[in-house]
Design a protein with these regions (language model features):
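ABC ATP-binding cassette signature C-motif
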Residues: 1-147
Length: 147
């Protein structure tokens, strides 16, 4: 994700940055709409966007690439809580593996993780998805060793 953010072409529009031969303009605009870019917003130059808007373009671009593995390092850093909630739901349709580093438990829950590795005291502990319901009550690790 960070690489995609750095590779956005600043002098091109949002639509041009996510353009792909695999998708029609309608499909691209629909995908961008899922990341809160509507109507003529898609014709804005990337250089005019806020950091949060650039993050949304990069995340949309990542999902459109159909990679089988996504590595996301703090993908919600530049997003307000309402936008995080909307954007997080877009990852539910992704069928590959997502490795995400995040301090945002609500985003992690939204993207539908099945396992979580947490570093509560400098060592990795693995927890089940149910931990998200009791995020601040970290008492029952499934495993405390790295496999």
């Amino acid at each position: 994700y960070a690489q995609e953010l750095e590779l956005l072409e600043q002098d091109r529009t949002i639509l041009e940055n996510v353009d792909s031969q695999e998708y029609s303009e309608w499909q691209l605009r629909t995908a961008l709409g899922n990341f809160l870019f509507y109507d003529n917003d898609v014709f804005k130059k990337v250089e005019t966007l806020s950091p949060g808007e650039k993050a949304r373009v990069a995340l949309c671009k990542v999902l459109l690439q159909k990679a089988n593995l996504l590595v996301l390092d703090e993908p919600t850093n530049h997003l307000d809580p309402e936008t995080q909630e909307i954007i997080g739901g877009n990852f539910n349709v992704y069928t590959g593996t997502i490795i995400v580093v995040s301090h945002n438990p609500s985003f992690v829950e939204q993207i539908g993780i099945s396992r979580m590795l947490i570093l509560p005291s400098g060592r990795i502990e693995e927890y089940s998805r149910e931990l998200l319901e009791h995020y601040y009550d970290i008492n029952t690790p499934i495993c405390t060793d790295i496999c």
